[in-house]
């Protein structure tokens, strides 16, 4: 039988989000056959005790690639590296599904799809592009007629010191958000990703390095990839969902209003300088499926 696990990472500051992610998974009966593994990047002993009965393995995250010493005090940055080495930490599984701890599972179908997507050693991942999504590209007009265009991929590539030819190859490729992905243990994608991660870390820039490396792996090295629908990794900072009051679930705001699979609070939802990820009391104005004005949190709630 194929052994599957969902893996995440957290420090002590994001522990409430970690608990919410775990609860959002375990509320589904289908999760009984799937393990949950946690990489510890600074959890307290009390926090570890609180989740131990709900998860299957907890391992201390390491610096799997050497980085400048002055970065090593920031334990949460280990998430930028360790997710590329999951089979090393948790070797007893055939399929891995990574979910950032600032994301949570809204509907189960997406979980099955991620595990299906990585079959035949493919990478299962979602592109950060879709109807209504905020653009990640910026244009500076020079002398009124020439355009200097900067995309998220190109910016990160140049900041990491990549060759211009490689930066241009990924400049206009739809950005891949590495907050949710699936891979089989024996996939060659791990080795290619790790190779690219070493390149992106060469100048000492850690934040964003793993995402840039996976974009290189797909768009430069042509790793076999299964692209999943945008609702499988819904970036709330790009576009708010709508809420279906009848079915008590979040949906895409555009017709046909597909149910959100994974809600991802990447980059945060900020109000008066406070991030919803650190204060669950923060609420935002969204629409109901029927068009009513609602004030809601986008964090997981079991109510």
Report residues per predicted region:
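Glycosyltransferase catalytic domains, chiefly GT-A lineage
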Residues: 1-303
């Amino acid at each position: 039988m194929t052994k599957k696990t969902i893996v995440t990472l957290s420090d002590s500051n994001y522990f409430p989000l970690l608990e919410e992610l775990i609860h959002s998974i375990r509320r589904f009966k289908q999760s009984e056959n799937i393990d949950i593994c946690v990489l510890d990047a600074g959890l307290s002993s009390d926090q570890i005790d609180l989740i131990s009965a709900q998860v299957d393995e907890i391992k201390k995250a390491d610096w799997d690639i050497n980085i400048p010493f002055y970065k090593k005090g920031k334990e949460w940055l280990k998430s930028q590296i360790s997710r590329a080495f999951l089979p090393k930490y948790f070797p007893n599984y055939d399929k891995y599904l990574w979910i950032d701890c600032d994301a949570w599972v809204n509907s189960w179908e997406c979980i099955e799809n991620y595990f299906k997507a990585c079959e035949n050693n493919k990478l299962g991942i979602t592109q950060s592009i879709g109807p209504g999504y905020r653009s990640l590209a910026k244009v500076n007009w020079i002398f009124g007629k020439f355009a200097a265009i900067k995309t998220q991929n190109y910016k990160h590539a140049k900041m990491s010191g990549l060759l211009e030819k490689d930066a241009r190859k990924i400049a206009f490729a739809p950005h891949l958000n590495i907050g949710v992905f699936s891979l089989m243990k024996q996939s060659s994608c791990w080795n290619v990703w790790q190779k690219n991660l070493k390149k992106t870390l060469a100048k000492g820039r850690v934040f964003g390095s793993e995402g840039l490396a996976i974009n290189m792996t797909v768009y430069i090295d042509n790793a076999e990839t299964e692209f999943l629908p945008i609702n499988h990794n819904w970036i709330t900072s790009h576009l708010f969902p709508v809420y279906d009051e009848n079915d008590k679930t979040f949906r895409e705001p555009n017709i046909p209003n597909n149910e959100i699979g994974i809600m991802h609070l990447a980059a945060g939802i900020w109000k008066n300088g406070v991030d919803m990820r650190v204060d669950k009391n923060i609420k935002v104005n969204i629409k109901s499926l029927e068009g009513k004005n609602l004030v809601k949190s986008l964090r997981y709630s079991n109510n």
